[in-house]
Amino acid sequence: GMNPNAKIPEGMTYEDNTFLDMLKEDLNINVVYDWVASSSDYDEKMNLCIGSNTIPELMNVNAEQYRALLKYDLIQPIGSYYEDYASDKLKSYVESGGEALQKVICNEDGEMMAIPAPNITAGGVNEMWIRQDWLDNLGLEAPRTWDEMVAVAEAFVKEDPDGNGENDTIGILGPANSDYVNGNGGNRYGLDPLFSAFQSYPKYWMKDDSGNVVYGSITEETKVALEKVAGLYADGLIDPEILVRNDSSEPLLAGKVGIFFGPWWCGYTVGDATLAQEADWQAYFTPLAEDGKFYTHMAEPTTKYVVASKECKNPEAAFKIINYLIEYEQGWVDSGATSGLSTSDLYPLYNVYDNANEIEVSYDCLKKYLAGEIGIDDVDYSTHKLLKSDMEAITKLKKEPYDDFSLEYWNFEDEDLAKTNLPRLVSIMVGDAPLVNEEYVPIYNSYDGRTKTMDSKWSNLTKLEEETFAKIITGKAGIEAFDSFVEEWKASGGDEITKEIQDEVDMQQ
């Protein structure tokens, strides 16, 4: 899959470039492309190859393609090659994904079928981000339950938390017209936690206790959640321009918003407000469900799979190529050896490799480092690419007390240093704090492939769902519209798709 806008230096091509020379010279691996396609045509071309069983020996595929390759029995197990050839670093990345990752890269016999590039676990968890300074102005505690959140949102709308005498504040921000109420994994400005509080997981395929697959958007729990969210909108507590405005960042950065939802990296989203010292944003697992637990849907453990066809005689080459990338990529960047070359465009089987728990590890190390429990030389940085620079920056940017990450305890004197590092440090130390310090119940998608009927009917079903949810939330339709939506969804291909997914999931048991 080639980026059509890739900048390829003069005299080089995809088939003839520095990276391929290195692999030939250092590993005696001769990389030959079966075909080259731009990113936009790549999936189509790969799907054709899968359909006609003319796949390359080694390839980088997405989740849907991987499921299809497994289903049609076109790829070989690579577990023994993994044991013998994967470097310690590659193994540590794969192991960091734990059981959730193992489940998706193994076939029903438990054999490893793919080399994954793990997704960062924290990226799939949406939390409540809230203006701590507004809470302080109004003498309120950070809300944790649904009812507390409602009371705080009401105060944010009605009690002039910014003290400007104007009635111009938004309690809970929502998605703009190009965003989503519910997403898969991380969903900035979405309302996912408002649904999970009722154990509703729209857009996810759930397995019930007896192993039956159910689509999360059509459950009774989702009906309950929609009615509750519609109530917030009717009471003026959710952005009145939800799903209409062009950009939800606008009111946010204008200082008009008290609460929004999103993943750990939203420290970057509020970065400008932090750097201007205008807003103290903190993150919480809110709202808790009635049983006091925080339920959250998770991102897929990986969306990038490197696989070997049944015909491939040397699957170990894939491990050697990936080991080499992991070992030397940072060095190439630091030394300028590959300047002008885009590794992601030209390196074969390229993926970004990270630890699934990278952000939690970073939080833990930075916290211990600030507390004087570890020194800068006590950490193995070999698989933690950014941690050393984080540690160096945090000592200069953090004021005492070292365990309080409120706005006033950051140091803003060195503007350049703050600009470069603070949004990231806030993302880790504020955004990831709930994930490290509190329990949560992770809910995974049971199916991330694509069935036959999905090809023809899924986009219409998705449109029906999103339009219905939007109408119910904004009061253009009553909650009874949910029941007719479910009927229509089932009759228009939903039941058919559910059965196809059930068959696939049963096969994998």
Model-derived features with residue positions:
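Helix-loop-helix "hinge/cap" segment bordering the ligand-binding cleft or interdomain interface
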Residues: 79, 107-186, 207-256, 306-341, ...
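Short, solvent-exposed loop/beta-turn-alpha elements that line the ligand-binding surface or hinge
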Residues: 77-97, 141, 202-220, 289-296, ...
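Conserved N-terminal structural module of periplasmic/extracytoplasmic solute-binding proteins
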Residues: 1-149, 193, 213-215, 333-335, ...
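General small-molecule cofactor/ligand-binding pocket signal
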Residues: 30-36, 240-241, 282-284
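Conserved small-residue motifs centered on glycine
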Residues: 330-467, 476
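Extracytoplasmic/periplasmic substrate-binding proteins
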Residues: 2-18, 122-129, 136-142, 177-235, ...
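Polar, glycine-rich mid-to-C-terminal structural blocks
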Residues: 227-230, 279-288, 294-375
